[in-house]
Design a protein with these regions (language model features):
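Bacterial N-terminal signal peptides
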Residues: 15-26
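C-terminal transmembrane beta-barrel domains of outer membrane proteins
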Residues: 34, 133, 447-610
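Gram-negative/organellar outer-membrane beta-barrel architecture
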Residues: 35-41, 207-219, 231-417, 597-609
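Short loop/turn motifs that connect adjacent beta-strands in outer-membrane beta-barrel proteins
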Residues: 273, 303-309, 333-335, 371-379, ...
């Protein structure tokens, strides 16, 4: 009976999602008519998504997936002196705390730093400290109650992440009834990597941490350095920055230093390979530029020793190709990056015209981690993109498109437990502004909204989630979804538009079947996530229902795509090599008549990483 109830709930849940997608479909003008509203005249060229931007989007999604799969940082703290074995609830009245020895009346409790210095400001609020000391003020205190006070003050700092900070007794004036407590802030004395101090390497000196010139990147990855207060969240952030590279699996042990209160941050990280390679093939490409696509990539991690990453990726189809190079380096809570993309395509328009385009993009990025806990991660990011697109029509040069775009946004990750499994939700949102500087094309003062703009304001947002559902017997089922889109009030150039269709938006269609200045999409998936492992191979069957709508400002009216189907993901690990693939069959439910009749599409990819 219980299994039947679970099955019924899953069916009702997926039926609700289907009704939501159906609602999107029915909003399409003429969706039930014989001839749906076309997105463009049949003779108009099909939208071509920049293959370089596709590669960049794939890398961002891969980064998001690695972040979701990132295990908690392994941090251990050696026992510190100054603690007690007392454990009395905070709300216990002082007079009820046993006091076997002599006592004295306390009229005032003063908290200071070492040597009478002012108390270091931390995330532990003054009101929290006052609440602890107020409970003891005006009472008789002996050694037992005094230890309780010190423990409670210490616990306030430890619970805030200052795991090596201790409250100790300072110089006393008992006769005046004043008790002085010194807050001995735990500080970082030094960093070590695999048992050796961090330093610039001499010629031919072997590296302890994998860098060729230095191991300074390990220390630079932490928000705090020698002499700073030691806080667990800062250590966690540093470990996460180090482990963002594929070759690293770092853990940290906080060891006592030479001076009381100081600690050595000992990093253990047997580094893996410096370089990784990827080869792949798929049939995700657009009909106009080539269905079959070949990909190759190389990634080099921490070559210099600054925890930097360098990657080079290439994608090629019969009528398009792109080369994308990326570099990123961390500095505490900051991560700076630069991406260079060079891509080109050509397509036949009608039967007489050949269109050729080439896009060169420079992207400068910055990310700042606002906060990190076991369950939440919050960050700010900004990117500046300079882009030039040159086009030809039958070997005649068209007006080049030059853009300078600044995007400022934020993202949030939340992990949670449900039905004895881990779920998550991610949110990414940003505001883009086209700038009139750096050689960008200037829009005319009287340019109509229907003309493509280089100076524009655009809002985009994407929320994605994984929700573990009740088990079906032994099978663990997860519902994965995503809702994304963008909005602007003026026409955009192709590189700034929203493309719908393909494995990253609406499955059952080829990449970028329709494009619009504004629109949205909804992805829904039910996946069996605990299929038994066979010979180190894993598979994941799933079924999906996706839909989305896009509109061009110059052509009023939304166009709709909707698809349904099923697929299978597979992964096999053999020593240091990994093989992965995916096969999917999708049926098109709704599509504009201008891009052809509805059809059933089979897509697949296979990749080899080593």
């Amino acid at each position: 009976m219980k299994t039947q109830q679970v099955v019924f709930r899953v069916r009702v849940f997926f039926a609700s999602v289907a009704l939501l997608v159906l609602g999107i479909v029915l909003l399409e003008p003429g969706a039930c008519a014989q001839t749906p509203t076309p997105i463009a005249p049949p003779s108009a060229p099909r939208p071509v998504q920049d293959p370089g931007q596709q590669l960049i989007d794939q890398q961002r999604e891969a980064t998001r997936q690695r972040r979701l799969a990132e295990p908690p940082a392994q941090i251990s703290v050696a026992p510190q002196g100054g603690g007690t074995s007392l454990n009395i609830p905070l709300d216990t009245p002082v007079d009820q705390i046993p006091e076997p020895g002599p006592t004295f009346r306390v009229r005032q409790i003063v908290l200071t730093g070492p040597g009478g210095q002012p108390l270091v400001r931390t995330v532990v609020s003054q009101s929290t400290l006052d609440a602890i000391t107020a409970a003891f003020t005006g009472h008789d205190i002996g050694s037992h109650r005094l230890n309780v006070l010190l423990q409670r003050l210490t616990n306030a700092y430890v619970s805030a992440g200052y795991v090596t900070t201790r409250a100790v007794l300072g110089p006393q004036n008992i006769g005046a009834g004043m008790l002085t407590v010194v807050i001995q802030m735990g500080r970082i004395e030094a960093f070590m990597v695999n048992g050796k101090p961090i330093h610039r390497l001499a010629t031919n000196e072997p590296s302890a941490g994998g860098g060729r010139l230095t191991d300074a990147g390990y220390q630079n990855a932490f928000p705090s350095g020698p002499g700073d207060s030691l806080r667990l969240s800062d250590i966690d952030q540093g470990v996460a920055q180090i482990n963002r590279l594929r070759r690293n699996q770092a853990s940290v042990q906080v060891l006592p230093g030479q001076t009381v209160g100081d600690s050595v941050v000992a990093i253990s990280n047997p580094p893996g390979d410096r370089t990784y390679y990827t080869l792949g093939v798929d049939n995700y490409g657009a009909q106009s530029t080539g269905v079959t696509r070949y990909q190759a990539g190389v990634e080099a991690d921490n070559l210099i020793g600054l925890q930097e990453s360098l990657s080079l990726n290439y994608i090629d189809s019969i009528e398009s190709n792109a080369l994308v190079g990326s570099f990123a380096i961390p500095w505490g809570r900051h991560t700076f990056s630069y991406t260079l993309s060079d891509s080109e395509y050509q397509q036949v328009i009608g039967t007489t015209a050949l269109e050729y385009g080439r896009t060169l993009s420079h992207i400068f990025g910055w990310n700042y981690q606002l906060g990190r806990t076991q369950s939440d991660l919050t960050a700010l990011d900004a990117t500046f993109t300079w882009r030039r697109t040159d086009r030809e029509l039958n070997n005649l040069d068209l007006d080049p498109q030059r853009e300078a775009v600044l995007r400022v946004g934020g993202n949030w990750l939340h992990r949670f437990a449900l039905n004895d499994a881990q779920g998550n939700i991610t949110l990414d949102a940003g505001l883009s502004q086209g700038l009139p500087w750096f050689g960008a094309k200037h829009d005319g003062a009287d340019a109509p909204r229907t003309d493509a703009h280089a100076q524009f304001t655009k809002f985009d947002a994407t929320v994605a989630w994984t929700v573990p559902l009740p088990r079906l017997g032994r099978a663990a089922i997860a519902y994965r979804g995503a809702l994304g889109g963008q909005y602007t009030n003026v026409a955009l150039y192709g590189n700034d538009q929203l493309y719908l269709g393909g494995m990253d938006t609406i499955r059952g269609f080829r990449s970028g079947d329709i494009a619009g200045d504004r629109g949205f999409y909804l992805r829904n998936e039910l996946a069996w996530v605990n299929v038994p492992v066979w010979h180190d191979g894993r598979i994941e069957p799933y079924m999906f229902l996706d839909a989305g709508r896009a509109e061009r400002v110059a052509v009023p009216g939304f166009s709709t795509l909707a698809g349904v189907g099923a697929g299978l993901r597979a992964q096999w690990q053999w020593h240091s090599q990994q093989f992965s693939g995916e096969a999917m069959v999708g049926r098109q439910l709704v599509r504009p008549a201008a891009i052809g009749p509805k059809s059933t599409l089979a897509l697949g990819t296979i990749n080899w990483s080593f």
